[in-house]
C-alpha cells in the first residue's frame, strides 16, 4: 500500500504526478497532479492506491473523496491526439504532466513522478518506479487521471458510437479492433500508431493479439 514517506522526507510542497492513456488506440493522454497541504487526511489514506488495483466503484469513491477533502490541490491536463502524432506518445505524456503541474495553485518544491523518466517541470523532480503503489500523492494522481480520462472517453463514445469507448476507454480490445476494421477511424484515433493503420487497411485481423502503443482540449475542466 502507498504511504506518505517520500513526501515527508522531501518536506515542503510535494506534488504527485501520474498519467493515463499511453497505450490506447484513441483519445488523449491525460495527466493529473495532486498536492496535499499538510499530509493526507486520515479518511483518505485507506482509499488511495494504484488506480489499476482499484475497482471502478472504489476509484469513483476515492475521486469524490479527494475533491471533497480540504487542503488537497488537484490539477488535470491532457495532450491531444494531434499532439501525440506530432511529438510521439512519450513526449506528449510529458507535455500533459507539465501542463498539470503548471495548473497547481503553487509551484511544488518537489514533484514525484510515477515511472523511470520525467519531464522538466522547472522544479526538482524524482522518478518513482511503481510510484502509484508507493506514494499516496502519486496514487491520488493516478486515480484522478484515470477517472477523468474514462469519463472523457465515455462522452466521446456518445458522439462516435460503435467503438465501445465507454467500456474500453480507447484501448485495443477485440471490440475496438473489430470496429476499426469495419468502420475505419474517427478524428480521435491515433492514426500515427502502426496498429491503427494496419487495422484500417485490413493488414491484421481484428482478433490479432497485441496492441501498439487532435481534437480534445488540453485543459479538461468540464470533465474533472
Swiss-Prot record:
Its biological purpose: Endonuclease that specifically degrades the RNA of RNA-DNA hybrids.
Cofactor note (record): Manganese or magnesium. Binds 1 divalent metal ion per monomer in the absence of substrate. May bind a second metal ion after substrate binding.
Gene: rnhB
EC number: 3.1.26.4
Gene Ontology CC annotations of this record: cytoplasm; ribonuclease H2 complex
Lineage: Bacteria, Pseudomonadati, Pseudomonadota, Alphaproteobacteria, Acetobacterales
Alphabetic keyword roster: Cytoplasm, Endonuclease, Hydrolase, Manganese, Metal-binding, Nuclease
Main location per the UniProt record: cytoplasm
Transferase found in the keyword field: no
Gene Ontology molecular function terms on file: manganese ion binding; RNA binding; RNA-DNA hybrid ribonuclease activity
Gene Ontology BP annotations: DNA replication, removal of RNA primer; mismatch repair
Chain residues that bind a divalent metal cation: 18-19, 114
Catalytic activity from the UniProt record: Endonucleolytic cleavage to 5'-phosphomonoester
InterPro entries tied to this protein: RNase_HII (IPR022898), RNase_HII/HIII (IPR001352), RNase_HII/HIII_dom (IPR024567), RNaseH-like_sf (IPR012337), RNaseH_sf (IPR036397)
CDD domains documented for this protein: RNase_HII_bacteria_HII_like (cd07182)
Species annotation: Gluconacetobacter diazotrophicus (strain ATCC 49037 / DSM 5601 / CCUG 37298 / CIP 103539 / LMG 7603 / PAl5)
Pfam families: RNase_HII
Needed cofactors: Mn(2+); Mg(2+)
Protein name, as recorded: Ribonuclease HII
Keyword Cell membrane set for record: no
Residue ranges annotated for the RNase H type-2 domain, each copy included: 12-213
Homology family: Belongs to the RNase HII family.
Subcellular location: Cytoplasm
Amino acid at each position: 500500500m502507498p504511504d506518505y514517506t517520500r513526501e515527508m522526507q522531501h518536506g515542503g510542497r510535494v506534488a504527485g504526478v501520474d498519467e493515463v492513456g499511453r497505450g490506447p488506440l484513441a483519445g488523449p493522454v491525460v495527466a493529473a497532479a495532486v498536492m496535499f497541504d499538510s499530509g493526507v487526511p486520515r479518511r483518505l489514506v485507506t482509499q488511495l492506491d494504484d488506480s489499476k488495483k482499484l475497482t471502478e466503484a472504489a476509484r469513483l469513491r476515492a475521486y469524490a473523496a479527494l475533491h471533497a477533502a480540504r487542503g488537497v490541490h488537484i490539477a488535470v491536463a491532457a495532450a491531444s491526439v494531434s499532439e501525440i502524432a506530432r511529438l510521439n506518445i512519450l513526449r506528449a505524456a510529458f507535455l500533459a504532466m507539465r501542463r498539470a503541474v503548471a495548473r497547481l495553485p503553487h509551484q511544488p518544491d518537489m514533484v514525484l513522478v510515477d515511472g523511470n523518466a520525467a519531464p522538466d517541470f522547472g522544479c526538482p523532480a524524482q522518478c518513482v518506479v511503481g510510484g502509484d503503489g508507493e506514494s499516496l500523492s502519486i496514487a491520488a494522481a493516478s486515480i484522478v487521471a484515470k477517472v477523468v480520462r474514462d469519463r472523457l472517453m465515455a462522452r466521446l463514445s456518445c458522439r462516435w458510437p460503435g467503438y465501445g469507448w465507454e467500456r474500453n476507454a480507447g484501448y485495443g480490445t477485440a471490440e475496438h479492433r473489430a470496429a476499426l476494421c469495419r468502420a475505419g477511424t474517427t478524428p480521435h484515433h491515433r492514426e500515427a500508431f502502426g496498429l491503427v493503420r494496419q487495422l484500417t487497411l485490413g493488414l491484421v485481423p481484428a482478433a490479432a493479439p497485441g496492441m501498439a502503443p487532435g481534437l480534445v482540449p488540453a485543459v479538461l475542466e468540464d470533465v474533472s
